[in-house]
Every structure is written in C-alpha cells, then in structure tokens.
C-alpha cells in the first residue's frame, strides 16, 4: 500500500487558504503538552491558554479524563488547536478524533497508527529518535515529526545531525524543553516548534491557578516570537 501524507491547508468559503496544522504550530512556536486528570479542569484551562495567546493544547491520552476533556475544549473553542498526544493505538486515534481532536501525536513511530492516520487524512506527528525512524517518516511523505524525549537524547545537536541527511523533515522536540533552553531549540531552523508542559504543570492545574497558567502561556509565546524575530 502506497501512502503519502499531504496535510496541506485547505481553502475556506472565501477561497482563502487556511493554514495547515504545522503552519499554525510554527506561528505559535510552542505547543502546550497537557495532562488532565479531571474533566472539570478542561474548560478553565482552555480559557487560560486562549487568554494567554496560546490557543493550542496537546492533551495526552494518559488519563481517563483525556477524551472528554478534548471534547469540552473543542466545543468551547472550535478554532483552538486541540489535539491528542500519547496516542498508541488506532482505537485511541478514532476516540480522539471523534471527540474533536484536530491532530494526533504519538511518542514513537508505530507504522500501523501512522499509516491509518495518513489513510484517513488525520494530521499525525509521530515520535522519532533514530535515523531509521526518520527514514520511515520520509518514506511516507511526512514533513514534521516529534523528537522525544529531546533532552535525554541529545537535544539540538542530535536534531541537527539527524536533519542533515533527512533535509525535508522538521522537528517538534518535546521532553525537557523549558524557558531556559527554548532559545537553543527555536534558533535552529530545522525545528518547527517545541512541545512543553512548563506552562501547564499539573500542580498549577490541580490548584486552579489558571491566571498563572495564562501568564506563563503569554510569556512562552512572547519569548518564542522574540527568538524568531
């Protein structure tokens, strides 16, 4: 079966081209990686991210609350970039998309999950860590991949080395990315954006400190824009 990814922007009713998911990621510079243990936190968290100028969330499928949280966030903010992370199976892909997820992120490269998403034209950003993973992504026509866990596997230096032979790929490093090293990552032209959880930490969500989350989201977006000019 020959599968090629083609997640390009589509035209709206006025004939204007809409930005693709990847283009929207690039414009933001940062993608919040969210873990929600209680669905009651979904709406106020979405409010905080939108207020902070970061209308995007990769909601990890690690908890029982993930699916319904995606549904709540997507319904409250239809234009928000709400996606599902830590997706391991086709069944989870279907559940996430049915709940309103606009994109799928997986921690590793599972050919079955990736091929399914491509076939269904669901934007998929699979995790890679080796040149063999990168080769599989390129073979399928993918343009953007997650690099995870980033810091534990060499960070920017490894990404630059990996990008040298695989020139068509852009990377979304996640894992160990913070305000302290964001400049190192976003200064690399092979990096599309960074995934991070520092602005949506579990303890802040649990404590209901959504104003602080909004402020931290704002700081992250402003720093990303400053770095990239």
PLM regions with names:
Residues 7, 13-99, 119, 179, ...:
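Conserved N-terminal beta1-alpha1 strand-loop-helix module at the mouth
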Residues 50-55, 76-79, 98-104, 119-125, ...:
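Glycine-enriched alpha-helix->loop->beta-strand junction motifs that scaffold or abut catalytic
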Residues 89-99, 132-140, 178-192:
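Catalytic cores of alpha/beta
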Residues 107-113, 146-155, 190-209:
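Glycine-rich phosphate-binding active-site loops on the catalytic face of alpha/beta enzymes
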Residues 131-143, 155-165:
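Anionic-ligand binding region
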Residues 171-179:
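Active-site glycine- and acidic-residue-rich loops that bind
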């Amino acid at each position: 079966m020959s599968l090629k990814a083609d997640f390009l922007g589509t035209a709206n009713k006025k004939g204007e081209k809409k930005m693709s998911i990847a283009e929207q990621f690039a414009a933001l510079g940062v993608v919040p990686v969210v873990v929600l243990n209680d669905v009651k936190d979904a709406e106020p968290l979405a409010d905080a991210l939108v207020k902070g100028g970061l209308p995007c969330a990769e909601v990890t499928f690690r908890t029982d609350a993930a699916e319904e949280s995606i549904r709540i966030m997507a319904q409250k903010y239809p234009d928000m970039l709400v996606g599902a992370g830590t997706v391991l199976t086709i069944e989870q892909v279907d559940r996430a998309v049915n709940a309103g997820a606009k994109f799928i992120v997986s921690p590793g490269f599972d050919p079955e999950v990736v091929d399914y998403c491509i076939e269904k034209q669901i934007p998929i950003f699979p995790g890679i860590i080796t040149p063999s993973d990168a080769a599989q992504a390129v073979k399928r026509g993918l343009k953007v991949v997650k690099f995870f866990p980033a810091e534990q596997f060499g960070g920017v230096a490894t990404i630059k080395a990996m990008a040298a032979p695989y020139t068509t790929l852009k990377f979304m490093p996640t894992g160990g990315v913070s305000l302290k090293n964001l400049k190192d990552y976003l200064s690399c032209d092979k990096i599309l954006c960074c995934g991070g959880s520092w602005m949506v930490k579990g303890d802040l969500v649990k404590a209901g400190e959504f104003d602080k989350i909004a402020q931290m989201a704002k700081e992250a977006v402003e720093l990303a824009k400053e770095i990239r000019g």
